[in-house]
Amino acid sequence: MKIILLSGGSGQRLWPLSNGTQAKQFLRLLKSPEGEKESMVQRVVRQIKEAGLLESITVATSMSQADMIANQLGEYGVDIVTEPARRDTFPAIALASAYLQKEKHCRPDEIVVVMPCDPYTETGYFHTIAKMVKAVESNAADLVLMGITPTSPSSKFGYIVPQAGDASAEVQPVNRFVEKPERALAEQLLAEGALWNGGVFAFRLGYITQIFEKYVNAPSFTEVRARYQEFPKISFDYEVAERASSVAVVSFTGQWKDLGTWNALTEELPSQTIGNVVLDEQAVNTHVVNELDLPLICVGTRDLVIATSNDGILVADKDHSEDLKKHLAKLGTDSRPMYEERRWGKYKVIDHIEFADGQKVLTKRLCIRAGKNISYQVHHHREEVWTIINGTGQLVLNGEQRNVKPGDVIHIRREQFHAIRAITDLYII
């Protein structure tokens, strides 16, 4: 069995902590069994490891998130497949399946499980995946989905409606799918025994390759990736699940949450405050996450979520936190992330100014982890000035190599090739 983890998202749902490169699944806000901070994706992969399935993971993600995946999951040695462009879940799954077929040389009868990288769930979830695999092995259906037993007639999820029959059966044929219904219809669907669509699919590799080869039939994974734009921009549900002639569902009744809103996330945070925060005794149902170095004091607040980062500040009534996305549109699309993690380390933007003469100055604080490096590169339109503030490293500037230490200042002019490797953790402004 192979697992494809889908990692996407635009980073808007938990703004200002999340952004285009640091989507919600990468926020280290949860607590591991050892008491350490962990992200949603780290939690899921840890659970997969505990289920004995670690060696089978391939993460399908965008190029902008690849470094974050490598940083957070590097210790697990997962494979990473990057989309050349974002084109929804069907192309992403097709590309990852092509990787399994053409790079990992998996057989057509290899069973593949596709799942999101960020469900907040428990061990029984992975036992249900095992049941899905068993259903595919026994040819109960070509495509098997996980259905989450609903806790309310929610309009936030799609629904899977099983065929009439034995509702207690472990595997049920699917009658139809309903996409995010209004509450009245959702209540009717619950009466019919409908399940939330958990976005988890199981199938044989040959099943999906026959489908994606209708669009891109190429001898190598490299060519499939090069022709990625030929895949339709459509979800896996629409392109495959809803058109499947042989589809079944296995239900899961344990803990399952989508931590995609501030209201949902705060219910699972290990404490009411994270960061430099003072919350007075009169504060009621208030959660504060402060990523800034500045102190934040809350007095007499009620039913609020407050979050601060270098990207902005959010103060929201918890019941209205789901409305965040429509307000973000007012900020425009030209804002850049103020914090990013890369394969070599991380950086934070600490100042950005444009002078009257048009000159722009961007100031960053970089941390390059010991043994990592920024690759040999050249800039055609800007100059850089590096000040080493802590640690030691090896600099290559226009082919000349030298060691650098705290206090060294390096002026990198246009058209000069440069690279730097950290001997110890290296901090640069």
What feature does the model see in each segment?
Residues 5-7, 60, 113-116, 145-149, ...:
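Short beta-strand segments
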Residues 419, 423-429:
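Double-stranded beta-helix
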